[in-house]
Structures are given as structure tokens and as C-alpha cells.
Regions:
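Short, structured motif recognition centered on aromatic/hydrophobic residues
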Residues: 5, 12, 19-22, 47, ...
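A short, acidic/glycine-rich surface segment
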Residues: 33, 63-68
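A short beta-turn/loop motif at secondary-structure boundaries
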Residues: 36-39, 73, 109-112
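Vicinal oxygen chelate
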Residues: 5-13, 45-48, 54-55, 68-142
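Long, hydrophobic N-terminal alpha-helical segment
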Residues: 1-40
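Alpha-helix termination/capping residues and helix-transition junctions
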Residues: 2, 25-28, 75, 97, ...
Length: 142
């Protein structure tokens, strides 16, 4: 059912500080500008690697869901892993049929890549928050 790993989400209190790590320490040169996703309550920036992306996620506003994560992990850290799926609704239904909890209403919403996404609860995924996203077009490939 799942396709390739698309990205690993990393929560951070400062995307700008995280850029320094990826640029200065790891030598990455392809990093997108920071942009707001108000409907999700986050700022995002993508670190583009040859085979995947790192999604840097910073809270946007007081109601951001990332605040809770950073309260427990003040320096930030791995937030989720994201896999591509060819059919987001079939993937959602398959997760539910297998007893996994799809977060929110279960209706896909548009994610940072401009395609529908869902999140599956970590308690059902070995302790890892899993994002499933509709396979994006070539413009969004690392």
C-alpha cells in the first residue's frame, strides 16, 4: 500500500536555527524558504536531499499543535514520517480496517505539498506519528 518515504518531519523552535545545522554542519545547499501554513498552525521549510526531504516545522501562533511537542521536547526533534500512497482515501480506509486511529475527522486535508494528507496515531504505529500523503506530482519531488 505505501510508496516511498517522502519526508521526515522535524519540529523546531526556530527554522532559521535549523537551517544553520543543515547548511553549516551537514552541507545541504537546497533548502526552501520558510512559509506559513495558517490552516495547520505552522511554518514549514523543506531541506531537499537526493532521496527524500526533511520538513522543518515551527509553531505559527499560540494555537499551533507543535507547541505541545516542543513543550515536551524544547530543542525539537523528529515529529513524524511521511509516506506516499497512490490513493489517500483507500489508504485511510485500510488503516481504519486494520484498527489504526486516523487523527482528526479522518477526512484528508491539504498538506504542505499541496496534496491530501492524513495522520495515523503513534499508538497504532509503533510510537511513530505517520503521515500518509497522496503521491505528489513531479514538481514536489526531491
Amino acid at each position: 500500500m505505501i510508496g516511498k518515504l517522502n519526508h521526515v518531519g522535524v519540529a523546531t523552535p526556530s527554522i532559521e536555527d535549523s537551517w544553520k545545522l543543515y547548511r553549516d554542519v551537514l552541507g545541504v545547499t537546497d533548502i526552501t524558504d520558510k512559509r506559513a501554513l495558517p490552516e495547520q498552525g505552522v511554518w514549514v521549510s523543506f531541506v531537499n536531499l537526493p532521496n527524500a526531504q526533511i520538513e522543518l516545522i515551527e509553531p505559527l501562533g499560540a494555537a499551533s499543535p507543535i507547541h505541545g511537542f516542543l513543550a515536551k521536547n524544547p530543542r525539537g526533534g523528529q515529529h513524524h514520517v511521511c509516506f506516499e500512497v497512490p490513493d489517500i482515501l483507500a489508504a485511510r480506509d485500510d488503516m481504519r480496517a486494520k484498527g489504526a486511529t486516523v487523527l482528526g475527522t479522518g477526512e484528508p486535508r491539504i498538506g504542505a505539498h499541496g496534496v491530501p494528507v492524513i495522520f495515523v496515531h503513534p499508538k497504532d504505529m509503533g510510537g511513530v506519528l505517520v503521515e500518509l500523503m497522496a503521491t505528489p506530482g513531479e514538481a514536489h519531488r526531491p
